[in-house]
Amino acid sequence: MKREWWHSLTVYQIYTRSFCDSNGDGIGDFGGILQKLDYLQELGVGAIWLSPFNDSPNYDNGYDVSDYYKVMEEAGTMEELEELIAACEKREIVVMMNLVLNHSSHLHPWFLEARKDRNSKYHDFYIWKEGTKEQPPEGGGAFFGGSTWEWVPEVQEYYYHSFSVMQPDLNWKNPSLRKELYRMIQFWMDKGIRGFRLDAIDNIVKDGHGGNDTHSEQIHTYLMEMNQNTYGKSEQILTVGETGGATVEMAQQYSDPESQELSMIFQFELMGIDGIRSGNWDPKPYTLPQLKQLFEKWQTGLEEKGWNSLFWGNHDFPRVVSRFGNDREPYREKSAKMLAVLLHGMKGTPYIYQGEEIGMTNVSGLRIEDYQDIESVNFAEDRKKEGWEEEKIRTYLARNSRDHARTPMQWNAEKHAGFTAGTPWMAENQNYEEINVENSRKNPDSLFYFYQKLIALRRKNDTLVYGDFRLIEEENPDIFAYERNLGEKKLIVLCNFRDTAAEMKARYDLTKGTVLIHNDTESLTKEVWKLQPYEAYMIELLQ
């Protein structure tokens, strides 16, 4: 496998409007990120991935772009973005931007012209079907609720939208549209952007029946064309495609260097293991062996061909420690460290979502009217129409809402968690006086420094980056154990997922190994690997 510069780095995802506000308007911005670059450099990340910053009416927090060449006013100015990119370059931090290429805003000039006249050159930039106002075309439901079709009386046609009615899908069959998108990507590359996260990129091909054909070979054809015309011209560009339903075989094709499509993808099989935000949002129980099998499938499936992205969550899912760990004291930080060891010990490029490195948790006690995420708002409205009791709706929102990940970053114990001098666009989590960056940096044993150590390990340990993956005792219900092998070196990772002690038979004499990272003070014996609640080890052995 050819070694790439992005194999050993760690990416930090910034949800800009919730990260840091520099001008007191209550919304995070480029100036706020610039103020915190030294913090990110201290953490050790090699890239920052910024949430959408193109001009937008913000019905979906920037995922509805009205101008691909401008930045949204709330985020700052083009000059401030250029200053941020330059400051990152000095710190050897790559800036990645979000590209929303499946759809635009309904207020984009292309769509405003398209909806006026069937003969407009922009009409075919979107997807239309004839019908009557009373009889829409056949099709499934949109991701954010309701029909995928919306009537436009001016042209007597329906337009297609995978997400909300304010996000009409672009027609990738049109070569003129694709040319416009490629020109735009080159514009941002010329600005110094060195990474792109391609939003919902597996939705760009439609099945002809009111749905997205996420398994179409045509997607790969388009991606190869885009690669050849834009980012593929430079080895310094990192790309990751959001392909939620991708199989291992599809991921191999997307991320195999021979295919010349993408560096890697985000697949969401892990994100769906417990039923969060999938189907009707009902909880889905799972076992630790099932979790192991899922990780093993992706680790071994992309071992020789392609590359994994590693993540526990992002802006679309509840907080990591609340979902997969234990956010109650005394186990919040310890379980978060365990989850970090498990993920960062695997093969792939790790992604950290802002606040994960200090153990931010889900917010509690929200009323239905407090939720701001468009998906949560629509879910509540739809369930009310179905006759659900308010308490049941609140329970489902408390477990599933994307808003948990979008509360302001907790910098210190001051008002509004140090996020803003004004009124925050979204209320902060009320545990900010305890859980914040300032407290973490004061404590040498904190989660922040634990992440710092893991990130540094990946930069210098080839076994951690390129070693083969092998699961150990896949049926053990309490301990997730695996090894990584490269040449004469072996890494052993042991993680106890329980709030009680657990053990397994020793496979190797780890007393002769070098402990690379550990979240407890206990030591292992030759005969039995006994782990305390949420204890985690990463140990290196010479074979």
Regions inferred by a protein language model and the residue ranges of each:
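Active-site and adjacent substrate-binding regions of carbohydrate-active enzymes
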Residues: 1-543
